[in-house]
Amino acid sequence: MTPNVLVNGIGASFGIATGPVVILMGPDDFGVMIDDAVLVCPMTTPEWVPVMTRASAIVTDEGGKMSHAAIVCRELGVPAVVGTGSATKDLNGVPTVTVDGSKGEVYGS
């Protein structure tokens, strides 16, 4: 069976993780983050690190292999797909996903 690829991007931190989707558009949304969720956001900056440590995986609209999200995810050992272009839109309403940080793919679960 072929996985249902919902989003493609750059595999920025190796590993595979599954979890509920939480879309955060900025720091004002940090309060809705839940532990072990897949964090989906436009991009990250240093103020995002406390939220990033709670994620099972991270998916961003922007960035590359040397972006803040990619570097922090590698340090934390959290799978990441960056530079998707539209994950915050494409994953809106999707309850759960699996992130493959090696292939740069996000699958519907």
Regions found by a protein language model. Give the residues of each.
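Long, low-complexity segments enriched in small/aliphatic residues
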Residues: 1-5
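Acidic, glycine-rich flexible loop/linker segments
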Residues: 7-37, 42-109
